[in-house]
Amino acid sequence: MEQIKRHLRSAAGYLAVCAKWLVLAALVGCVVGPLGGAFGLALNWANATRGAYPWLLYLLPVAGLVIVFLYHRFDPDGGGSTNQIFVSVREHKPLTLRTAPLIFVSTVATHLFGGSSGREGAALLLGGSVSGQLGRALRLENRDCRLMTMCGMAGAFSAIFGTPLAATIFTLEVVDVGSMQYAALLPCLVSALLGVFISGKMGLAPEAFVLQAEAAPTPDNLVRVIILGALLSALSIFFCELLHVTPKLYRKFFPNIYLRVATGGVLIIALTKLLGTTDYNGAGTAVIEAAIDGEAVPCAFLLKMLFTALTLGAGFKGGEIVPIFFTGATFGCVAAPLLGLPPQLGAALGMVALFCGCTNSPLASICLAIEVFGGQCVSLFALACAVSYMLSSYFSLYREQHFLHSKLRIVGVQRVHGHWSETDAAHLTTNDDGEN
C-alpha cells in the first residue's frame, strides 16, 4: 500500500509540473506570438517599402546613427547581439525588457533603409527578453526563468519563420552543442506551436517551398551530396570568420562608433550603386526563391556575405540566418550542376546545410528541411547536414556557443586558451583555428 501511495504521489508531482509548464508555455506563446507576427509583418513592410521607394537607401547612414545612439543610450552593455540570449540561458539571467523594443525598431530600420541582415536572430532576442521578464514578473525561480526564456526563443522563431519543430529543437540544441535540455522540449514546443498559429492568424505566411527536382539516394548521389556538404562546411567557416573579423576591422580603422556605422552605410550604398541591383539589400528572400527554382548569379553568395558582414559589422542590427539561407541557396544552386545534381536540389541542400555548419545544430537543420521542403529528399538533407556539421570544426556564428563533445570522436571537449580541445588524454588535440 505504501508503495502505491508513493507512486501516486510521484504521478501527482509529474502531472502538477506538466500542468504548470503547459500553462506557462501557453502564456509565453500567447505573448511572443503576436510580437513575432508583428515583427515579421513589419519587416515585410520595410522590404516592400524600400522596393517602392529606392531613395530610402540614401538614408541608411542616418538610420545607423540613430540605431547606435539608441543602443549607446539605453543598452550600452548588451549591444543587440544574439550572443546575449546565449549568456542569458546559460547563466540564468533574463535579458532586460528594453532589449525587445530596441531590437524590433533597429532591425526594421536596417531593412527599411537597405542594410543586409536577417530576422530570426533578432526574433530570438525579442522573444527571449520578453518571456524572461515575464518569468520574473511571475516571481519564478531563476531556473524557471531560464526555461521561460527558452520558450520565448522558440515561440518567436516559430512565429516569424513558421517552423515550430525546427524552432523547438534549435532552442534546445544551439546554446550548448551536445547537451539538449529535454525538460524544455514540451514547454518550448507548446510555445512554438502557439506562436506560429497566432502569427498565421495575423497574416504572416510560413516559409515553405516545393522542390521542382529531386534525386534518389543512390550511391552516386550520396557521394555527390557528401562533396557538396564538405564544400558547404568550408563556406560556413569562411562566413563565420568573415562576420567575426569585419567588426574588428571596423573598430581598428573607425574607433568612433558613430563614424563606424555611417561609414558602413556609405559602403553599402556605394556597393549597391556599383552593382546596379538591390538583390543584396534587406533579407533577399526573392533571390532565395529564385535559387530554389534553379536560377542564381554565380557570385551572388560572395556578394551577400560581403553585404551582410559590412552591415552587421558596422553596427546595424538584425539576424544572420536569412543571409545564411541566401548564401547557401545561391552557392548550392551554382555548385550542384558541377557535381551532377539538379540546381534546385542543390539550392535547397545548400540553404539547410550551410545553416547547420554555421550554427552547429544538425537536428534542428534536418527538422527545418522537413518543415520547409515538406519531407522531400529528407535522407539527402540529413547527409548534407551531417557532413557540414562534422567538417565545420568548432567554428560558430555565435561566440557564446559552447561545445561539450568532440565532432570527431566520442569524447568531451573543453575550451583551453580560447580553443576547443578534446578532454581524452589519449587523443588530446587542440583546434588552433576553431576559436569562437
Model features per residue range: what roles?
Residues 1-436:
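Alpha-helical transmembrane segments and immediately membrane-proximal extracytoplasmic
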